[in-house]
Regions:
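A structural signal for conserved, well-ordered secondary-structure elements
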Residues: 1-325
Length: 325
């Protein structure tokens, strides 16, 4: 019985033949994404824009009615609230965005919290307030700064790791691919004005991890083939390496997609942004590994000599003395 193969063994797609137009498309998409970020801006959630969090417990209900709570709070005019269970199933966290002037005024913020609590207590007899916190604009600004530092540190550490493990050209290629993936994710959030919260930072870090893993698999095969086929042209060798790892790439992507699509289509609204980000990252991460990370190696002059140990000056002198050079 033959096993089903998504990618035949003799697959030979000339990926690098179209490296220039596809790389140009990548650059244009990056530019468009950042243009959207700077013109439309990101729709920051409570974590990054400031707001109010109310924590409560339903004393006589096994599971907190998250959907109904979201609808109830939305009628109060606080925008699109984020309602999530935490701890036990009957415990809930309700987060709403507040205008900057309200968030900065403790009394006004407390009045908003009281408004939410009184409305929900009138609707649910077993609604018990556990506490509430006001996230000011200053604190949310610190969150944004910390998140930015985390992303930059992750990308810097990754570039250094690739540089040490392979060659500096590989580090540049991997870093560009990651920048491509993060940029397109931010562009999607700016275009559709999806809420940008700490959950999305976690999603972006997951995207970076997936894209990096895919890139390293291809890079590792490229390194092996550079040592094995020393006379082969680099573009042809890169095509060979990508085709040899294509089955693994397709299988990994499809497996993740099978897990993500049900969450994207039928999951709770509170997870939609995070799942959408990871789903997009799945596609752009695969694309960038092939059409961004690999072509850069050609333009930066990677050859089979890149992985041949350099001879010392003494060895070169000895070869010259023997007339071998």
């Amino acid at each position: 019985m033959k096993l089903l193969k998504l990618v035949p063994d003799d697959t030979n797609i000339a990926f690098l033949k179209w490296r220039v137009p596809f790389f140009a498309i990548s650059v244009l998409l990056i530019a468009a994404s950042w243009a959207l970020v700077f013109t439309k801006g990101l729709n920051y959630g409570v974590d990054f824009a400031g707001g109010l969090e109310v924590r409560a417990t339903f004393t006589q209900t096994a599971e907190a009615p998250v959907g109904d709570l979201r609808d109830q709070v939305a009628t109060l005019g606080y925008g699109d609230p984020v309602v999530q269970r935490f701890g036990e199933d009957n415990q809930v966290s309700i987060r709403v965005r507040l205008p900057d002037e309200v968030s900065a005024d403790k009394e006004a913020a407390q009045a908003a919290a009281n408004d939410i609590v009184e409305t929900l207590q009138a609707e649910y007899d077993d609604f018990r307030l556990d506490g509430n916190d006001n996230v000011s604009g200053k604190v949310s600004g610190e969150f944004r700064q910390t998140a930015l530092y985390a992303l930059l540190a992750a990308m810097g550490a990754i570039a250094l790791y690739i540089w040490v493990r392979f060659e500096w050209q590989f580090g540049v290629g991997a870093l560009f691919a990651l920048f491509h993936d993060v940029s397109l994710t931010l562009g999607m959030f700016a275009l559709f004005q999806l809420e940008f919260s700490l959950q999305i930072i976690a999603a972006i870090l997951a995207i970076i991890g997936y894209s990096l893993n895919d890139t390293i698999v291809i890079y590792d095969r490229i390194r092996e083939n550079l040592k094995k086929y020393r006379k082969m042209e680099v573009p042809a060798l890169l095509d060979l390496s990508v085709n040899e790892t294509l089955a693994r790439t397709v299988m990994t992507s499809l497996t993740l997609l099978v897990a993500l699509l049900p969450l994207l289509l039928f999951g709770p609204a509170s997870l939609f942004g995070m799942v959408a980000a990871i789903t997009l990252g799945l596609f752009v991460g695969t694309y960038s590994s092939v059409y961004s990370a690999a072509p850069i190696l050609v333009w930066l002059g990677v050859t089979s000599d890149s992985f041949v140990p350099r001879e010392s000056a003494a060895d070169e002198q000895e070869k010259k003395a023997r007339g071998l050079v």
